Amino acid sequence: MGIETVEVWKGNLADVAVQQLLKRVQIMVPLFIEGGVILDLDEPEWTLERWTVFFYYQKIETKEDNPYLFMGYSTVYRYFHFQAATNESGSKKEAKADFTLPLDNISFSSLPCRSRISQFIILPPFQRSGYGSRFYRSIFDFYLAEPETVEITVEDPNYAFDDMRDINDLRRLRALPEFKAIKINGKITPQPEAAIPNNIVDLPALETIRKRMKIAPRQFLRVVEMHLLSSIPKSVRKADELDDSNPKMREYGLWRLWVKKRLYKHNKDLLSQMEKEERLDKLDEVLEGVVTDYVRLLEAYNSRVKIDNFEKLAQGKGKGKGIEGSNGKRSSPSDEDSDSSDGEPLPKRAKV
């Protein structure tokens, strides 16, 4: 058995060689993605240019002619991301008619965009072995370093991908000291019948981190909620009543209020049709489901970190290559259509 490495190669779908590769492998889309659609390669070139395809290989150094073993692939689509023009003071600039259309010197690839992971397939022999996480992190790293990408989103992920994404996003964010410094403001005293305070957590600091890490708003808030919940002891979460004089219980009560605010905003259309008492009961029910799911994900996260740390101690850092261009040269390092807080009905997904 030879030395094993993994490699990620990328190419633009307007490239004929990439099209030929994709033709051979996208037969797997209807087999592994429920409701998945095979990409139409007869689209105009300007449309194909908005697609990037990442191919994932295992390479085993042996005497065989072809040491590469195909493990999976992913497609990413670029959506134009409109950003309101602002001046140095942060206020919007006045529109000026000092240019004419069309602008021949501007290409779509040079404009700010939302890069959306559309299809993501890992073949069964390589599933549940950490390969999917490594592939996801490689794609994310590439777009995190790409100046044109403003946000990295995912199109209609299934539950398995959701779990992998949550765990890896949490791990990425926890590597930032400024993220680990985010705490619940225990000095807040919510007033009965009043709106939930906006300063339970430092929202400006969170937004700065979110934009830097290019994570879509809803996904980012979920990971923040998960991270903050991890500091709450199990005994506090299981308590029948929260004692406000206990700092951790007070913190947990504020956490619950903050999460409820997001859940209500996210499902406002449905909840607004209910009577107040029914609405409050429904929010409590959904919140308990969220807590249960976060606890499950945090346990999976801790298990994954332990496994990765053990592997590093046992065999050193994993070998692998960065993302390669379709021409064989190293390329420069460089959820959803919309991740806004509202728009997705409550019954659609268990994870909210």
Language-model features, listed with the residues they occupy:
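Non-catalytic substrate-recognition and accessory regions of acyl/acetyltransferase enzymes
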Residues: 1-115, 141-352
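Conserved acetyl-CoA binding element of GNAT-fold acetyltransferases
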Residues: 114-124
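Conserved acetyl-CoA-binding loop-helix of GNAT-fold acetyltransferases
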Residues: 122, 128-141
